[in-house]
Amino acid sequence: MIDFGNFYAQIAHGPLSKWLEVLPAQLAAWQRDSLHGYFRDWNNAVERLPALTPHRLDLLHGVCAGAETPLSEGQRIGIEKMLRTLMPWRKGPFELYGIQIDTEWRSDWKWQRILPHLSPLAGRTILDVGCGSGYHLWRMVGAGAHLAVGIDPMQLFLCQFEAVRKLLGGDSRAHLLPLGIEQLPALAAFDTVFSMGVLYHRRSPLDHLYQLKNQLVSGGELLLETLVIEGDEQQALIPGERYAQMRNVYFIPSAAMLIRWLEKCGFCDVRLVDQCPTSVEEQRRTDWMTSESLADFLDPADVRKTLEGYPAPLRAAFIARKP
């Protein structure tokens, strides 16, 4: 099973110590009552991986680890087999001892787009909400973060994260907890909070923005990345049963409307820092994620539209500050 004891010890004497009033009981209840039916298989794959200490570690330009002496073919095949047990891999990519995990999303492209607009992450305590496999947590560490904490209730992502951590030498500068943001108390303890690809899945987007604000210190920075539509501050798309074949998409505002939402929730210095269509090069089917991907969700007669006739995915990133 996953041992969160190191994380508890790390936060016991810092600004996150208040979290320990509820967190150990929450995670004990999760391990007792809420494990996914395949969790033991996934966790077994993690446990069977060797604990490696990389001779070469690059988290600044990617998530890349290498040994001083290349792994034998048998070692590489064994590690890759365990990693493939944890498919599908959606967020990455990872380069681990000669094994290329070519994930569905080129999450490194998103990082390249947003990083120039962020306040320096060096020395910061960071929360990444809906962090997936934790790819961006490692990039935050590479940018100098003191501590990067990710939360995501999807248990496969937790096992993917722990697998990567084990191959990175057990690095304790990043942690992933199997929680949703609604399970966090108002900690007001993070210097930077990220929410990327989450807002449109929330039934109440303003509540989500307040939850993000409640995690920030005064003066802290929010990076919000989400789907938007073209339009003025009065426009939002409320899809029907599906959007790009996703069932759980509730609100897709225009960028102008989302700026108003952020301001209404009490954020200041709100600015749009990036907006671009999602391409089939950035999100696609790979050998590590073999089911349908973006190309299958667009109208083959007009790729500017989804199969349902809505505008194709357009993603925008915003930076805002808590007063």
Curated annotation (Swiss-Prot):
Alphabetical GO biological process terms: tRNA wobble uridine modification
Instruction: Supply the CDD domains for this chain.
Output: AdoMet_MTases (cd02440)
Its keywords, alphabetically, are:
Transferase, tRNA processing
List the SUPFAM superfamilies: S-adenosyl-L-methionine-dependent methyltransferases (SSF53335)
Q: Where are the transmembrane segments?
A: none
**Entry EC number(s):** 2.5.1.-
Its domain of life reads Bacteria
EC class of this enzyme?
transferase
Presence of keyword tRNA processing: yes
**Catalytic activity as recorded in UniProt:** carboxy-S-adenosyl-L-methionine + 5-hydroxyuridine(34) in tRNA = 5-carboxymethoxyuridine(34) in tRNA + S-adenosyl-L-homocysteine + H(+)
The keyword tRNA processing is assigned to this record = yes
Q: Which residues bind carboxy-S-adenosyl-L-methionine?
A: K91, W105, K110, G130, I181, E182, M196, Y200, R315
An example of a GO molecular function for this protein is: transferase activity, transferring alkyl or aryl (other than methyl) groups
Q: How does it assemble?
A: Homotetramer.
Q: What does this protein do?
A: Catalyzes carboxymethyl transfer from carboxy-S-adenosyl-L-methionine (Cx-SAM) to 5-hydroxyuridine (ho5U) to form 5-carboxymethoxyuridine (cmo5U) at position 34 in tRNAs.
State the family it belongs to. Belongs to the class I-like SAM-binding methyltransferase superfamily. CmoB family.
Q: Identify the NCBIfam families for this entry.
A: PRK15068.1 (NF011650), tRNA 5-methoxyuridine(34)/uridine 5-oxyacetic acid(34) synthase CmoB (TIGR00452)
Q: Which HAMAP family match?
A: tRNA_carboxymethyltr_CmoB (MF_01590)
According to UniProt, the name of this protein is tRNA U34 carboxymethyltransferase
- Recorded source organism is Edwardsiella ictaluri (strain 93-146)
What does the record give as the organism's lineage? Answer: Bacteria, Pseudomonadati, Pseudomonadota, Gammaproteobacteria, Enterobacterales
